[in-house]
């Protein structure tokens, strides 16, 4: 079920009503009905769409609450300064789960997300469970039907479980099994968060991955080269971040908290090798769970990631 953006979420400190250099995002955001959006001849600006769904987390036996994530992120983002002076920033609202099967909600989200991707220079998809990634893939493939897609996931988990239905832990297996013209790179894998069968599947499918342990002090030149080579080898990049990759000291409000997770600045350093590329069609950020957040710490962290990713 799709609902348009809620203006009441977008509030913040007012420093000026006339000087754009003192504006914050709540002063520049606009609201549109994505279901009625016509294709633009020239993509421009930024589109934001929320995936207010945690059914996939429940099916994956995780702790629910991430369906409240998109609104919490938008509220935190609203008060940040508009340093980029975006040519356009549109909140398209959220998609909610009201179908019998999760896959139908994912398809509905994908149809709408594809419109944003086709019309904007940047599209941010805010979760919600990490089943958003499969929906993001469907949207990407709709916009780019023949191009090679490189999927980059900053995550503690492979999320390549073999299940009978979509969950927050199956997205990347679904993508790889359905589409031979895709490849998968995972940054931040937790050795204690993935079974041997998942490592075996990674070997079988030639999934490139980097352990969290390799990213704790710095991002080495070897890893930077790996990322840049992966971007270079693909026509389109689908970029996604699962917030459970970040240590729970910084990100307590997630579906599955990390005890040996990454520092936020490490995630930013990794993203610097990805975001600047014009090949990046969309960015999704998943598993922000306000139910377990402290002082809105995780919501603010996601908001600041989006803020840093703006071009």
From Swiss-Prot:
It comes from the Bacteria. It is an enzyme of class 3 (hydrolase). GO terms for molecular function: agmatinase activity; formimidoylglutamase activity; manganese ion binding. Its cofactor is Mn(2+). Pathway: Amino-acid degradation; L-histidine degradation into L-glutamate; L-glutamate from N-formimidoyl-L-glutamate (hydrolase route): step 1/1. Mn(2+) 2 binds at residues 155, 157, 242, 244. PROSITE patterns: ARGINASE_2. GO terms for biological process: L-histidine catabolic process to glutamate and formamide; L-histidine catabolic process to glutamate and formate; putrescine biosynthetic process from arginine, via agmatine. Its EC number is 3.5.3.8. Mn(2+) 1 binds at residues 130, 155, 159, 242. It catalyses: N-formimidoyl-L-glutamate + H2O = formamide + L-glutamate. Binds 2 manganese ions per subunit. Keywords: Histidine metabolism, Hydrolase, Manganese, Metal-binding. Belongs to the arginase family. Catalyzes the conversion of N-formimidoyl-L-glutamate to L-glutamate and formamide. This is Formimidoylglutamase.
